[in-house]
């Protein structure tokens, strides 16, 4: 799996998920750093718009869609819940879409 493949797909689906209240911010972690191995998961940073309903179900659907497309484990991090340390680490890796 190549970084470009992931970024292109995230850009493609971003408008669809924004209509559902999810803002796909970008890719971080080993794929963003070009250090991924076969065992690496894909790390995606999102935020959720205020007044979005059914957040858990929609987030689960997003994760399921991404894992089906990429055939890899996907971790979805929500900016709102990141610790200051995690935010600091991610800011250096994050590739915005």
Where are the regions a protein language model picked out?
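Conserved histidines in hydrophobic membrane contexts and catalytic metal-binding motifs
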Residues: 27
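Catalytic core of pol beta-like nucleotidyltransferases
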Residues: 1-24, 32-38, 49-97
